[in-house]
From Swiss-Prot:
SMART domains to which the protein is assigned, alphabetical: S_TKc
Pfam families: Pkinase
Regions of compositional bias (Low complexity) in chain numbering: 395-418, 432-444
Residues at the catalytic site: D128
UniProt source species: Saccharomyces cerevisiae (strain ATCC 204508 / S288c)
Domain Protein kinase: 9-278
Protein name as it appears in the record: Casein kinase I homolog HRR25
Region ranges (Disordered): 394-494
Family, per entry: Belongs to the protein kinase superfamily. CK1 Ser/Thr protein kinase family. Casein kinase I subfamily.
Major subcellular location class: cytoplasm
One Gene Ontology biological process: ribosomal large subunit biogenesis
Family matches, as SUPFAM superfamilies: Protein kinase-like (PK-like)
Length: 494
């Protein structure tokens, strides 16, 4: 039985949860396009989906704002159909073992600034800035950061007169305590400054892997919020941003000194990180940590498969197989990371726990040498496998292209860049993959993209009239099962 909303959108597996509802994978039965469907019970104590859908419609057209396809009531549920997106930044953060490089954080920050500035420019504040509410796109929008979950958003000024809402106190905490601003904890009405302060906490979290107020013990939610507030009040900006470039400290100090109704200087804040990117000689090429790690792993495994196919490597040998234990998974990730650092040393610059000061760009760039030294312990066969895998990909790509009357361009060979810059190892294969994704998107080929936390739930439809295909299911998910590990022998030498 097909369970549908809006007559043409079929409900699939559960893929996540928002502030006031669950989100499911869906399919447009007419076009085959994949979508996301958010359901909220009409018996909810504080229904928000109708309000959220109106905010989406009002913000539609902005870069990184999902497009709403349909909203309405189906049976005992309010349903909203929007664009299907990729993994959240929290999912990707966990994939990268809870640490992003400075380059990835800067590239994300510049996009997140733009999303928040657009929302503020349309007279709304988000009020729940956190990694879970920023998702990467799919296909040709795979490098674009999207913002979701406007159930807690609020209009902070009049649409016509732009008159700001009045200052108030004794407000309850709205949002996520970990990333909430100090003024939000103090019960002060939120405004634009609070979204930006929350974003600062998110960026520091990405760099350091945690925030000082995580892991505090408490018996009640109120006690936990109070302890988080106390910790935030006692941690200075200098301490919070120790070990990070000075620009992070300047950003947090600026946000904390904003007045309630003051318009932030978004250009100044963006310029802080743009200038830092220039000082560190980064390129905004949208090649994030997870992109490089997945690409590196794929190239090594590609060479493993070729060696097994040629008979040069036994798939069941100790060199080609690996245990599925947790320790071995961690070791595998570390080897992949070292491989990526060896090939792309200027990309992986990280926060160092021992740093108690704000490192200069020159000190950060010195990590390039450390990255090379750290990767020197890798077996030569791993480095050769990565090189061979990349070379095989370049050789096979022209053969995979669709034949046409015009000759296909040949892939460029790796060349050492002038002035001792890094070789152009990766753009060509990744850009060609993006071009193929773009062509598939234009041909309306459904793309199977799921979030890292997706598991198929069990759907009980016994309480529904099977003759009414448009009635949504009574969602009763069984406890989620962890994803099954790959069998031994799926990673070369890892």
């Amino acid at each position: 039985m097909d369970l549908r909303v809006g007559r043409k959108f079929r409900i699939g597996r559960k893929i996540g949860s928002g502030s006031f509802g669950d989100i499911y994978h869906g399919t447009n039965l007419i076009s085959g396009e994949e979508v996301a469907i958010k359901l909220e019970s009409i018996r909810s104590r504080h229904p928000q989906l109708d309000y959220e859908s109106r905010v989406y419609r009002y913000l539609s057209g902005g870069v990184g704002i999902p497009f709403i396809r349909w909203f309405g009531r189906e049976g005992e549920y309010n349903a909203m159909v929007i664009d299907l997106l990729g993994p959240s930044l929290e999912d990707l953060f966990n994939y990268c073992h809870r640490r992003f490089s400075f380059k990835t954080v800067i590239m994300l920050a510049l996009q997140m600034f733009c999303r928040i500035q657009y929302i503020h420019g349309r007279s709304f504040i988000h009020r729940d800035i956190k990694p879970d509410n920023f998702l990467m796109g799919v296909g040709r929008r795979g490098s674009t950061v999207h913002v979701i979950d406007f159930g807690l958003s609020k209009k902070y000024r009049d649409f016509n007169t732009h008159r700001h809402i009045p200052y108030r106190e004794n407000k309850s905490l709205t949002g996520t305590a970990r990333y909430a601003s100090v003024n939000t904890h103090l019960g002060i009405e939120q405004s634009r400054r609070d979204d930006l302060e929350s974003l600062g906490y998110v960026l520091i979290y990405f760099c350091k892997g945690s925030l000082p107020w995580q892991g505090l013990k408490a018996t009640t939610k109120k006690q936990k919020y109070d302890r988080i507030m106390e910790k935030k009040l006692n941690v200075s900006v200098e301490t919070l941003c120790s070990g990070l470039p000075l620009e992070f400290q300047e950003y947090m100090a600026y946000c904390k000194n904003l007045k309630f109704d003051e318009k932030p200087d978004y250009l100044f804040l963006a310029r802080l990180f743009k200038d830092l990117s220039i000082k560190l000689e980064y390129h905004n090429d949208h090649l994030f940590d997870w992109t490089m790690l997945r690409y590196t792993k794929a190239m090594v495994e590609k060479q493993r498969d070729l060696l097994i196919e040629k008979g040069d490597l036994n798939a069941n040998s100790n060199a080609a197989s690996a245990s599925n234990s947790t320790d071995n998974k961690s070791e595998t990730f570390n080897k992949i990371k070292l491989l990526a650092m060896k090939k792309f040393p200027t990309h992986f610059h990280y926060y160092k726990n021992e740093d108690k000061h704000n490192p200069s760009p020159e000190e950060i760039k010195q990590q390039t040498i450390l990255n090379n030294n750290a990767a020197s312990s890798l077996p030569e066969e791993l480095l050769n496998a990565l090189d061979k895998g990349m070379e095989n990909l370049r050789q096979q790509q022209p053969q995979q292209q669709v034949q046409s009357s015009q000759p296909q361009p040949q892939p460029q060979q790796l060349q050492q860049q002038p002035n001792g810059q890094r070789p152009n190892y990766y753009p060509e294969p990744l850009l060609q993959q993006q071009q193929r994704d773009s062509q598939e998107q234009q041909q309306q080929v459904p793309m199977a993209t799921t979030r890292a936390t997706q598991y198929p739930p069990q759907i009980n439809s016994n309480n529904f009239n099977t003759n009414q295909a448009s009635v949504p299911p009574q969602m009763r998910s069984n406890p989620q099962q962890p994803p099954q590990d790959k069998p031994a022998g799926q990673s070369i030498w890892l």
